[in-house]
Regions:
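Short acidic-hydrophobic sequence patches enriched in Asp/Glu that either
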Residues: 1, 92, 303
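Rossmann-fold NAD(P)-binding glycine/threonine-rich loop
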Residues: 1-8
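Short, well-structured alpha-helical segments that form the helix of a local strand-helix-strand
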Residues: 4, 147, 289-292
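C-terminal substrate-binding/catalytic lobe of Rossmann-fold NAD(P)-dependent dehydrogenases
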Residues: 10-48, 52, 56-280, 284-285
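C-terminal amphipathic alpha-helical interaction region
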Residues: 265-266, 270-311
Length: 311
């Protein structure tokens, strides 16, 4: 344990933000170490798998926010990068938002074009997102946002088919933004945050079911804590998850925690508006829309599966 603690990433004890310093390759001194013993029988590997599945969701949601801003608000890459940079100072403060802001502000030295615009829009996968989705199906746990993030990569990979389909299939004409641009940007941020809450709720619910199935004793607050540094999903948001499980270690779903419930209540009007606008403009938003559908399903006392059962 002492070895892992000494070489692990560290975060500030008050802010929860990752610490840096020292020589390259040397352990960071001070701070709270982002390492812990998860449990026996591969439980640590399982938690890492779910982390990666959540990561798939995070990355796809960010891509959808970018697509909406570029399409409806007609913002260029650099301008969107500035927006992401601002978002990184608030509730969306995270490694992925930070590097996305940097990427969007880069230009290709050969062509002078925005760097992101010369990157081919096809994405592969290493398998952990798929494993998370398959395991969720095996467990009977709803994790649609992670699954949609995986399917988005699958769809992106068939570039030639999409090029051909674009010449044949029809959709709505893209309409320009009608209204205040800054308010629209804030609405996209709110939609991203609400979708993120639902994605993490799915991931942590999957781990909760896994501990029952595999007879583990997972500390979910601690898991969120150690993800704050040295992980792709490291974010200020994780501190809120730790606080939620500190309030109630038996929390069934993050959505029922007071903080996250208040966030969804406050931001959901903008969340719904952005999803509606994207749909009306023919913009694919699989993780945004699946997150909202998950929320709707989870809060609905009587679902139409009574008819399914009757069938």
């Amino acid at each position: 344990k002492d070895i892992w603690t000494s070489i692990s990433a560290k975060v500030d004890s008050s802010s929860g933000k990752p610490l840096s310093g020292g020589k390259p390759g040397s352990p960071v001194q001070g701070g709270v170490p982002c390492s812990a013993y998860i449990g026996p029988n591969g439980s640590g590997h399982y938690v890492k798998m779910v982390h990666n599945g959540i990561e798939y969701g995070d990355m796809q949601m960010i891509c959808e926010a970018y697509h909406i801003l570029a399409s409806i608000a007609e913002m260029d890459s650099y301008e969107i990068g500035q927006v992401f940079e601002k978002w990184n100072e608030d509730i969306l403060d995270s490694f992925l938002i930070e590097i996305t802001a940097d990427i969007l502000k880069q230009s290709d030295p050969s062509t002078g074009k925005p760097f992101v615009e010369i990157v081919l829009d096809t994405a592969g996968q290493k398998g952990t997102g798929k494993w998370t989705s398959v395991n969720a199906l095996d467990m009977g746990v709803a994790a649609p946002t992670v699954a949609e993030a995986v399917f988005s990569r699958c769809l992106s990979a068939i570039k030639e088919e999409r090029l051909a389909a674009a010449e044949i299939l029809t959709g709505p004409k893209l309409s320009k933004l009608d209204g205040d641009k800054s308010e629209f940007i804030d609405s996209v941020r709110d939609a991203l945050y609400c979708s993120k809450i639902c994605s993490y709720a799915q991931g942590f619910q999957l781990m909760r079911e896994a501990q029952i199935e595999y007879d583990w004793n997972l500390n979910f607050g601690e898991i969120a804590e150690i993800w704050r540094g040295g992980c792709i999903v490291r974010a200020a948001f994780l501190q809120k998850i730790t606080e939620a499980f500190n309030r109630d270690s038996n929390l069934s779903n993050l959505l029922t925690d007071d903080y996250f419930n208040e966030c969804i209540t406050h931001y959901q009007s903008n969340w719904r508006k952005i999803i509606s606008l994207a749909s009306m403009n023919g913009i694919p938003i699989p993780t945004f829309s699946s997150a909202l559908s998950y929320y709707e399903g989870y809060r609905t006392a009587c679902l139409p599966q009574n008819l399914l059962q009757a069938q």
